[in-house]
A protein has these predicted regions:
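Membrane-proximal C-terminal cap and juxtamembrane stalk of leucine-rich repeat ectodomains
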Residues: 2-4, 13-26, 32-34, 186-290
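LRR N-terminal entry segment and analogous cap-like coil->beta motifs
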Residues: 33-89, 95
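Conserved hydrophobic beta-strand positions in leucine-rich repeat
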Residues: 38, 57-61, 80-85, 104-109, ...
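Consensus "Asn ladder" position of solenoid repeat domains
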Residues: 43, 64, 88, 109-112, ...
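Ankyrin-repeat and related helical/solenoid repeat scaffolds used for protein-protein interactions
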Residues: 139-191
Length: 290
């Protein structure tokens, strides 16, 4: 019995060593300072590295040439809390890419070539605290529900992009927001910007550079001015203007009122007709009795 165990010892040691190597395998061209960190910063990668440990928590991929992230990339990395994809060549996020990133706390997508942030992009990233989307020179569109579900988000960076406008609903859906960066965008101070300006006015304490750090182009002459020189009165001509949604509500309300009026008129006419017939019948009965 003991001789068998003695004979198996070298095999067990070899097996254990192999499992340890597999468990903490580090991708080539990357560094792994600890068992839960993979650092592939500045390695000239044109795609995501292979053999990333399944229990990775910090994945550093900045300063490479990675053009896209497969939608199923994060499925196997359920422990990932920190993902840095800054300064790559990303042009868009595949639908569902972040659908399994429920533990992700930090995400950096800055300095890429993103053009838009579609609705529902981060809806499963409920643990996300810091989101960096700045320095995307072609990012001109952020959908109204792009950040829906980010109830824990405290810091949002959208500076130095190509945003000329932003629906204020985007920011109103972030109850935990403490810091928002919007400077360096080509904002246009028209009536579409009015609601966002009022939100920024009320939440100026969340702007690291204050209202002074954000500029917009005046709708009249295109002159760039700091938001700090504007006030609610700067948008007073917008107060009486209706949006497309307002017009649709007015039209729908008008149709409903018209239909209700027709039904009410028909009902009233029917009641009057019945009353007249009943009155005529009673008159005939009274004449017959006489």
């Amino acid at each position: 019995m003991f001789s068998c165990v003695h004979w198996l010892q070298p095999f067990l040691v070899l097996l254990s060593s192999t499992l340890l190597i597999w468990g903490y395998n580090c991708p080539s061209s990357c560094l792994c300072p600890d068992h839960h960190t993979v650092d592939c910063t500045g390695q000239g990668l044109t795609r995501l590295p292979d053999s990333i440990p399944l229990d990775v928590r910090r994945l550093l991929l900045s300063n490479n040439w990675i053009p896209w992230v497969p939608s199923d990339f994060l499925v196997l990395y359920s422990d990932l809390v920190y993902l840095d994809l800054r300064n790559n060549s990303l042009t868009r996020l595949e639908p569902g890419t972040l659908s399994t990133s429920s533990r992700l706390v930090y995400l950096d997508l800055g300095s890429n070539n993103l053009t838009e942030i579609p609705s529902g992009t981060f809806e499963e990233s409920r643990s996300l605290i810091k989101l960096r989307l700045g320095n995307n020179p072609f990012l001109s569109m952020v959908s109204k529900d792009a950040f829906l579900g980010l109830t824990s988000l405290r810091e949002l960076e959208l500076e130095r992009n190509a945003l000329s406008g932003l629906d204020v609903v985007v920011l109103s859906q972030l109850p935990s927001l403490r810091v928002i960066r919007l400077e360096g965008n080509p904002w246009v101070c028209n009536c579409n910007f009015a609601k966002l300006f009022l939100w920024l006015l009320e939440n100026r304490h969340k702007l690291p550079m204050g209202l002074e750090g954000i500029e917009c182009s005046l709708a009249v002459d295109g002159q760039r001015v700091s938001l700090s020189v504007l006030s609610e009165d700067s948008f007073r001509e917008c107060r009486g203007m209706l949006t497309l949604t307002d017009y649709l509500i007015v039209i729908f309300s008008g149709i409903c009122i018209s239909v209700a009026a027709i039904i009410a008129s028909f009902f009233l006419a029917s009641m009057i007709h019945c009353f007249q017939r009943l009155k005529a019948k009673r008159t005939d009965e009274e004449e017959g009795e006489e």
